[in-house]
Amino acid sequence: MNGWTNYESWNVALWIDNDEDLYNLAKDCVKESLNAVLACDKFVKILDSLGFGMIRTCTHDGVVIDYNNSIEYFKSRFNELKEVA
């Protein structure tokens, strides 16, 4: 999967990188966090709060955007996002 450990991580990364709102949210979370784990946690919590806890936030391909599917993205992109944030 283009260097990703599984389809879900690849799909979430694809959507974050190619959806302006998700990408900007990821940048904001990185800007306000000391490391990738904290940035990912903040990102997922914000997305969950937007759904008011009633629905799971998913990519348009139906992959859930949760911590497990997002952490690899934040670990691989943290420094890059920090530079542009």
Regions found by a protein language model. Give the residues of each.
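Acidic interaction surfaces
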Residues: 1-85
